[in-house]
Amino acid sequence: MTLAADLPYRLCVGVMLINRDGHVFVGKRADVPFAPEGTGHWWQMPQGGLDEGEDPEAAALRELEEETGVTSASILGRTRQWYSYDLPQGLVGTAWHGRYRGQTQLWFAARFEGQDSEIDLEPKPGYEREFDAWKWASYGELPDLVVPFKRPVYEGVIREFEHFVLGT
């Protein structure tokens, strides 16, 4: 049995994509490895791994494009801190090929400057589908849409980016 304390966190970036109406993009995960069936906790904002030596802002824009097809976005700001979460014990040693105990994430707020028709969940060749549906959600409902172990991260990101959402 792998002990979480023996494993590192996976370095990641996340994007809170905010539209003109002050709503936030969320995608419904195509695979639901972390959400028990029937819970509805299948939604999340775009996020993904930070490659070694990669600039975090560039990684955030890359992940946004890979997962949503969106290129019409501008960065508004980033969180003051990295946010970490631990996987539930039952997933440690299996998720991400057993290499990580969870993720530590730097988040970016971005303004969506395109049209909804730009959003394309079809993956590029060589990539796996991240989301099979999407919607614009109010920022206040985000914590209830994600798996419970990510909720504190989302609450922190919301606190830091609330002024971007309300300033739209």
Residue spans for each PLM region:
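Residues that scaffold the ATP/ADP-binding catalytic core of kinase and kinase-like folds
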Residues: 27, 53, 145
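NUDIX/MutT-family hydrolases
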Residues: 107-111, 118-152
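Charge-dense polyanion-binding interfaces
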Residues: 159-168
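Active-site-adjacent beta-strand/loop module that shapes the phosphate/pyrophosphate-binding cleft
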Residues: 81-120
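The catalytic Nudix box helix
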Residues: 45-80, 138
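N-terminal strand-loop-strand
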Residues: 2-45
